[in-house]
Regions:
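C-terminal binding/interaction regions
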Residues: 2, 14-21, 45-48, 138-207
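Compact, glycine-rich, soluble single-domain proteins
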Residues: 113-131
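Glycine-rich phosphate/diphosphate-binding loop of Rossmann-like nucleotide-binding domains
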Residues: 51-79
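N-terminal small/polar loop signature for handling phosphorylated ligands or for N-terminal nucleophile
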Residues: 90-111
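Short glycine-rich or small-residue beta-strand-to-loop segments that form or flank ligand, phosphate
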Residues: 51-57, 82, 113, 154-155
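Short hydrophobic/aromatic-enriched beta-strand-loop microsegments
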Residues: 76-79, 131-138
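Protein-protein interaction and targeting regions used for scaffolding, dimerization, and localization
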Residues: 1-50, 75
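A short beta-strand-loop structural module common to alpha/beta enzyme folds
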Residues: 78-89
């Protein structure tokens, strides 16, 4: 795993600036989103010893979440544990939402969520604007989600993968560089679509 020391990722302002340029040509148009060519600065993940990671799980993912949190702290990360805190039955949307909210607000740089399959938590997290959650089950999906999709939340299925593989996925996911270049244009389109529908929802709410 790459040491927590290294170059920093693009700032939220830089990412928002790129998205805003895309939005200018999308909102109010019936045409598919168009993004400008170009890429944000190349970055290495993670950035520094102050990198803060939110973790969370339901009851099924609780044991694995605890182990991942311990290993992250050993590696020098600051960890915010959003629960759950026991084996008692709970609903995964509550904890997936808590983790995603910490990432979306900027309080935490990344999030890791564990449930039975990693799918439901990803669905919940991706409802939160600004979050790009990816369920990963091997090293290839971990690399792809970071390099190609600029994922900022990782979801894992405790019922599908063992503890050793889960930690390898976390290590890989945190160490892979965001690819930028052609991927930046595509991720900007994802963000543009998100903002387009957010604005539509706001107009309906204020109707």
């Amino acid at each position: 795993m790459t040491s927590p020391a290294g170059p920093s990722s693009p700032t939220e302002q830089e990412v928002r600036s790129l998205v805003e340029r895309v939005i200018d040509g999308v909102i109010g148009s019936d045409q598919p989103p168009r993004a400008e060519a170009g890429s944000p600065p190349q970055t290495t993940v993670p950035g520094d010893t102050k990198t803060r990671i939110a973790i969370g799980s339901d009851h099924g993912g609780y044991p694995l979440k605890e182990k991942i949190g311990f290993r992250l702290k050993e590696a020098g990360y600051e960890v915010l544990d959003c629960g759950t805190d026991s084996h008692d039955s709970v609903d995964y949307p509550d904890f997936a939402h808590a983790v995603a909210s910490e990432v979306a607000s900027g309080a935490c740089r990344y999030g890791v969520i564990v449930d039975g399959a990693g799918i439901g938590s990803a669905m919940v997290a991706n409802k939160v604007p600004g979050v790009r959650a990816a369920p990963c089950h091997d090293l290839s999906t971990a690399r792809n989600s970071r390099e190609h999709n600029h994922a900022n939340v990782l979801t894992l299925g405790a019922g599908l993968i063992g503890d050793a593989l889960a930690w390898q996925i976390v290590e890989e996911w945190l160490s892979v560089e965001w690819g930028g270049d052609r991927h930046a244009r595509r991720v900007a389109k994802i963000d543009a679509i998100e903002q387009q529908y957010s604005k539509v929802g706001m107009r309906q709410d204020t109707g």
